[in-house]
Amino acid sequence: MAPARSTLSDSPECWPTLHLADWKDTYATLHMWTQIVGKIRLELTPRLNHWWNVPLYVSPHGLTTSLIPYGNRQFDMEFNFFADQLLIRTSDPKSAALALKPRSVADFYKEVMAALRSLDIEVRIWNMPVEVADPIPFDRDTVHASYDADAVRRLWRILLSVDGVFKVFRSRFVGKSSPVHFFWGSFDLAVTRFSGRRAPQRNDPDPVLRKIMQEAYSHEVISAGWWPRNAEIQEAAFYCYAVPAASGFAEQKVHPAEAFYHSNLGEYLLMYDDVRRAKFPTTVLMEFLQSTYEAGATTGKWDREALEAA
């Protein structure tokens, strides 16, 4: 079996171990920190279809907001996991840096807001975390206060590798596709393909959730991603799901052999450790992405000839 692409690396250092038990407290803290930064981007950027103005993006040293407009200036915010800093850079000479170290979410939140004000950037965000159980307002969260720099660098190394594979996978589709982006609510890296057809209207009982989900899933999609944990699976895994999922989607044969369908989640999963241990992790991951996409596209009767690169 040959590597998927020569520009992608199968080196073990690019696919390090990352078990949740080893960094659970840091994960919970970093999740809140990324939500603070992500909400700043959300507040100051124009809304895009499918909430594409929400995510962060993998950068050479961590996660970045990309450019955020602010009056006659622009700025960005980057978690630099290589230097253990949150960097805030403006289009004028001003900048600020906050240390990434063991500290409470409340302290981090206050320092981020103070740093923005020092750069003449005023912004207010809803300070309640999302997509977590028992949320604590950012300014009152003294519970989450851990930072294991080594674990975070391993996370960053994985994100770099996965981002590269996802971008190659994305290049093989000529239909509408999302960027490869990091959603701070669910704390996962994802890429989404679209059939071009509208999806059925959502019927979620909660009206707020229904509005959010209707925008996210206004059109038929097949989405793949990676998360370091999930409420159902407390370990890192790759996933793929279809919305709407056509009849027979869950019964399709996918690759590699270790991949499986999780009925509670309604997703195909491939545990990260199965990829990491493979001789060619990039090839194994690409097999999962391609075969699960084909499972959704075939059962969903997508126009594959028109949508896929020749």
PLM ranges: what are they?
Residues Q214, H219-M271:
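Low-complexity, glycine/alanine/valine/leucine- and proline-rich hydrophobic stretches
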Residues R140-W227:
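Aromatic/basic-lined ligand-recognition segments
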Residues Y57-P135:
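Long, hydrophobic/aromatic-enriched structural stretches that serve as scaffold segments
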Residues A2-P3, L8, F260-A310:
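TerminUS-proximal long segments
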Residues S9-Q74:
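N-terminal ordered "arm"
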Residues L67-P69, F249-H255, F280-V284:
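Short conserved micro-motifs at the rims of enzyme active sites and ligand-binding pockets
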Residues A2-Y27, E111, R117-E122, A231-E232:
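Phosphate-end processing signature that detects enzymes handling 5′-triphosphorylated RNA
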Residues C14, D84-A97, V130-D150, A236-F238, ...:
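Glycine-rich, often proline-containing surface loops adjacent to acidic residues and nearby aromatics
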